[in-house]
Curated annotation (Swiss-Prot):
Keywords: Cell outer membrane, Ion transport, Membrane, Porin, Signal, Sugar transport, Transmembrane, Transmembrane beta strand, Transport
Known partners and oligomeric status: Homotrimer formed of three 18-stranded antiparallel beta-barrels, containing three independent channels.
Lineage: Bacteria, Pseudomonadati, Pseudomonadota, Gammaproteobacteria, Enterobacterales
Induction: By maltose.
Biological processes, Gene Ontology terms: monoatomic ion transport
Name listed for the protein in its UniProt record: Maltoporin
Organism whose genome encodes this protein: Escherichia coli (strain SMS-3-5 / SECEC)
């Protein structure tokens, strides 16, 4: 009994050490931004985005507190085989008060198994909700290839000249499909599940320092038995992507060409949309018909121009041509140079211009935005974070058209459609004006 008692403290110490090591193995990653800002004409900070554009230049132009908190752990490993559990919860509030309650968004919960298939060494099999191989332009916070959602797949299959990945994911739209109720009436209240099937071949070395990635995505509305879609709904569509990445000037340049059809044109990033309604209880949806095509040509990157200068840049042309004439032509160009005074202090400027033409009216909306920021960051790279910055932003815009959201889809035949700025004596779009803002912000990823 004495021997047992003497051994007990040692056993407890060993168990505590093992538990401590296991706890330390938890990976904590994430992203966050928050700050305070004012508008020159009074009030809290306003943010500026061109009507019809799918994004905005973000430096000194973000008006919310946003965070993604990721917890993950390798829960099993034997040789080169392993299982990894990953989660991600996101939050967003208006940053106007001390206490701002919000419901979290459960963005990720998945398990990834590596090297589980003997005859596919290096591959990963996965299932669950996941950010899946997302492609974006950081300076405008624009995701041009992103099929994230609940899904499953097999990725990084070595085919000799590249890596092959296969995946299926899902997103849903409110309304848009119906079941027969009574009195020959269809009640369009059921959510429509949209499936996306993704095939991509990446890491193909085609020139010194350059790689090519090709992808095909097919999206379709997946109805329950005995349900039907709203008449004119976009049932399915395709997205084709080619991206060349070149290592250059201690950074990279990406040149991207994408072509989409029908339901894959709305967001243009790989998620199917067009079978559902945009607002609850709108039986006759204004945007169910996304039939048409989209062409996107994009070039963006980040480079180093010597010891003291870094720069991000983007140039993009996007043409969404819909059969219902409610599409847009959007082109944007911008730069973000950074001068490093010391390894942890820099001055950053962002200049961006957007121009969006309405397919329906032929009118154009345009905006240019300039931000100057003094920044302190954890390192001497334009990608170094965390960063604390003070900024001043000036924006000027001239908008000739806007979207008509007066009334509802039942009473307004133009609901959700592009109309001239002075349509029916109204005031659509943001008109011709300018504004400036100033403030401070922190941004971090880890």
């Amino acid at each position: 009994m004495m021997i047992t008692l003497r051994k007990l403290p040692l056993a407890v110490a060993v168990a505590a050490g093992v538990m401590s090591a296991q706890a330390m193995a938890v990976d904590f990653h994430g992203y966050a931004r928050s700050g305070i800002g004012w508008t020159g004409s009074g009030g809290e900070q306003q943010c500026f985005q061109t009507t019809g554009a799918q994004s905005k230049y973000r430096l000194g132009n973000e008006c919310e507190t946003y965070a993604e908190l990721k917890l993950g752990q390798e829960v099993w490993k034997e040789g080169d085989k392993s299982f990894y559990f990953d989660t991600n919860v996101a939050y967003s509030v208006a940053q106007q008060n001390d206490w701002e309650a919000t419901d979290p968004a459960f963005r990720e919960a998945n398990v990834q198994g590596k090297n589980l298939i003997e005859w596919l060494p290096g591959s990963t099999i996965w299932a669950g909700k996941r950010f899946y191989q997302r492609h974006d332009v950081h300076m405008i916070d624009f995701y041009y290839w992103d099929i994230s959602g609940p899904g499953a797949g097999l990725e990084n299959i070595d085919v000799g000249f590249g890596k092959l990945s296969l995946a299926a994911t899902r997103s849903s739209e409110a309304g848009g499909s119906s079941s027969f109720a009574s009195n020959n009436i269809y009640d369009y209240t059921n959510e429509t599940a949209n499936d996306v099937f993704d095939v991509r071949l990446a890491q193909m070395e085609i020139n010194p320092g350059g790689t090519l990635e090709l992808g095909v995505d097919y999206g379709r509305a997946n109805l329950r038995d005995n349900y039907r879609l709203v008449d004119g709904a976009s049932k399915d569509g395709w997205l084709f992507t080619a991206e060349h990445t070149q290592s250059v000037l201690k950074g990279f340049n990406k040149f991207v060409v994408q072509y989409a059809t029908d339901s894959m044109t709305s967001q243009g990033k790989g998620l199917s949309q067009g079978s559902g309604v945009a607002f609850d209880n709108e039986k006759f949806a204004y945007n169910i018909n996304n039939n048409g095509h989209m062409l996107r040509i994009l070039d963006h990157g980040a480079i180093s121009m010597g010891d003291n200068w870094d720069m991000m840049y983007v140039g993009m042309y996007q043409d969404i041509n819909w059969d219902n004439d409610n599409g847009t032509k959007w082109w944007t160009v911008g730069i973000r140079p950074m001068y490093k005074w010391t390894p942890i202090m820099s001055t950053v400027m962002e200049i961006g211009y957007d121009n969006v033409e309405s397919q329906r009216t032929g009118d154009k909306n345009n905006q240019y935005k300039i931000t100057l920021a003094q920044q302190w960051q954890a390192g001497d790279s334009i990608w170094s974070r965390p960063a604390i910055r003070v900024f001043a932003t000036y924006a000027k815009w001239d908008e000739k058209w806007g979207y008509d959201y007066t009334g509802n889809a039942n009473t307004n035949t133009n609901f959700g459609k592009a109309v001239p700025a002075d349509f029916n004596g109204g005031s659509f779009g943001r008109g011709d004006s300018d504004e400036w803002t100033f403030g401070a912000q922190m941004e971090i990823w880890w």
